[in-house]
Design a protein with these regions (language model features):
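N-terminal secretory signal peptides that target proteins for export/translocation
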Residues: 1-3
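Bacterial N-terminal signal peptides
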Residues: 6-15
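Anionic N-terminal interaction surfaces
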Residues: 19-59
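Acidic, Ser/Thr- and proline-rich intrinsically disordered linker/docking segments
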Residues: 21-28, 79-157
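Short polybasic amphipathic segments
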Residues: 34-36, 60-64, 113-117
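Short acidic, glycine-rich loop/turn motifs
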Residues: 42-43, 66-68, 117-121
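Generic structural detector for well-ordered beta-strands
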Residues: 54, 74-76, 128-130
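Mid-length scaffold segments of soluble, non-membrane domains
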Residues: 58-89
Length: 157
């Protein structure tokens, strides 16, 4: 009986350390994100690209991969200057007109993550990602932990 307990203790300790090593080199991926790709000569219109936002702790890169597994951007942690999280709130006018005027009292909330960085040429760039409301807090926490940069928060009420 003691041999069984010793065996279980060894298995538990080995599995604990094995799990710790796996999580340290793991890629944190967040589905249902939209990269707002700036298009046009004036760079004022954005085309949303649906995909997955990932923080790779092994290569120290933030990357966005679209639904076809084509990388949209890749940013090194060292190149990141600042990270901004925004939560916007807008009234639901269409639902108020079509369904009930009480929808004016409820607001739709959208979550955005903006990363400012310098590219290889040394010029300042930025990317904006529309986050899913289900994992927005996790993305902000992961961005802060992975990059070591403080995430600025701007929230409308």
């Amino acid at each position: 009986m003691r041999l069984l307990w010793k065996f279980l203790a060894v298995v538990l300790v080995v599995s604990f350390f094995a799990n710790g090593q796996e999580s340290a080199g793991k890629v944190s991926k967040f589905d249902d994100a939209e990269y707002l790709h700036l298009t046009g000569a004036d760079k004022k219109t954005a085309t949303p690209i649906r995909g997955t936002l990932g923080f790779n702790n092994e290569t120290k890169i933030v990357e966005f991969v679209d639904k076809k597994n084509v990388p949209a951007f890749s940013i090194k942690y060292d190149a990141i200057k600042s990270i901004l999280y925004e939560r916007t709130s807008t009234p639901r006018y269409v639902a108020a007109l079509l369904v009930s005027p009480f929808f004016l009292f409820s607001h739709s909330k959208k979550h955005y993550l903006t990363i400012q960085y310098t590219d290889d040429a040394g010029t300042g760039q930025f990317v904006s990602i529309h986050l899913d409301k289900k994992n927005a807090r996790d993305v902000v926490a992961t961005a802060e932990a992975a990059t070591g940069k403080k995430v600025e928060r701007e929230e409308e009420k």
